[in-house]
Amino acid sequence: MSAPKPRIAAPNASLAGHLLDQYAGRIARSRRPYIIGVSGLQGSGKSTLAREMKVQAEGRGWPTEVLSLDDFYYSRSDRELMAQQIHPLLRTRGVPGTHEIELLLSVLAALPQASDKLHVAWPHFDKGRDTRMPPSRWPRVTRPPKLVIVEGWALGIRPQPQVALDEPVNRLEREEDADGSWRHWVNKQLRGYQPLWRKFDALIVLQAPNWDVVRRWRGETEEELLARHAPLAMDAASMERFLQHFERLSRHALATLPALADSVVEYDDDRHMTGLTHS
């Protein structure tokens, strides 16, 4: 029986600094914006880490932008149309196929040319209203960044083998996707995400222990929202159904992403960091 891994006292500030140290030489040498993907399942702290990395990177003199995959969701009205034309489960944002990936790619292509004459803007998604903010409230830059951080859930994930789609993984799939058409469609959409993954110069994966822990982390977040009476906060039953949309690909990500990552940050059940490896 192997000895348990020691906990590493590394809050976001020191973790962000270590990760920037790891890629500093490559960032400095790059003639175009260096792009880092930060991938983590719900509740893993990817957004917080990305923000801290931006603060520290700019402190080192590197103009930095953070793009969130969540900001590129299609609007509620667009997803309603998808639900009518393709599958009802596409009303719920989150799975591959509910992001406007071509727009994100166009933003990445435009950022090196950003200037006072060429402003580069990208969407900001209002999760409370389940739609995009008006363009007047979108982030806008007028200088080319040295570093771009793209953060999101399951960045880098590859499509599952077709045979893996045969059996449902939960009640949602058994009852609302009995013929498998939704999960096959979502898996097919992942092919369109691969050009984005290939833009990453480095991929950092925040690795949770297992799917049950991810469910608990996300549930804790929702409990906090309910306590604050936040709009669209979900009760336990609604939360469980919502998470079932992501269970299949979350389990796939937990099993496959570490082998595809340049850096893996491992966490225990309580979000304490237990390991950091670089390939």
Residue ranges and their predicted role:
Residues 1-36, 41:
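Extreme N-terminal, non-catalytic leader segments
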Residues 33-37, 63, 147-149:
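Residue-level preference for the first positions of well-ordered beta-strands
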Residues 46:
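Conserved lysine of the Walker
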Residues 49, 53:
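Hydrophobic positions on the alpha1 helix immediately C-terminal to the Walker A/P-loop
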Residues 55-65:
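Post-Walker A helix-loop "phosphate-sensing" segment adjacent to the P-loop in P-loop NTPases
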Residues 65-68, 72-129:
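Conserved nucleotide-sensing/catalytic segment adjacent to the nucleotide-binding pocket
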Residues 107-157:
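Phosphate-binding/switch loop-helix module in NTP-utilizing enzymes
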Residues 154-279:
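Conserved NTP phosphate-binding and transfer environment spanning the P-loop NTPase/kinase superfamily
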